[in-house]
């Protein structure tokens, strides 16, 4: 085989490798696009910045926040606020990852079976939509954590584990202190939002790297 032919084959093979590298790169677009579902701990109450915004600033990811106050897997706020509805809206933005952070509003429902059903519905909806779902349990601001909140966290964890979905426990220990909460204890201060961002970013970095 002549030198010219060998040179042409080399160029073709080199072009193929480059094309494959480009194709592979397209499977992992950057920045990572993340949609967040949650309650007032995520939506914020008169905060300058909330943890999803801080996460975007600290990582360079594209983050959309769909959280609404008093929402949960069962709790529905003013109507249409529940996590299943938030997932619907989040999917319209076509994110790669949907992070669902459990809220404390579900703790007022005595039947945790409802929480399991709601959590399974939200998780399955994301999986069917083709996005990757990661679940963070509800957090709190003091110990001992009320049993009602622990029961909700355990129910969500059970659903996530059975569904093969990554779950981050935010109660052992609680991520917040009373000083990081508003005076009415309804949501985190800016300092509390930053504390939540620290925890979620560290965990999410490790998960998306897998």
What annotation goes with each model-predicted range?
Residues 1-37, 41-46, 57, 91-94, ...:
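N-terminal secretory targeting modules
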Residues 16, 22-23, 72, 78-80, ...:
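Mixed-charge, polar/low-complexity N-terminal
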Residues 31-36, 41-118:
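Conserved SGNH/GDSL esterase-like catalytic core that processes O-acyl groups on lipids
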Residues 82-210:
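Alpha-helical cap/lid subdomain in secreted, periplasmic
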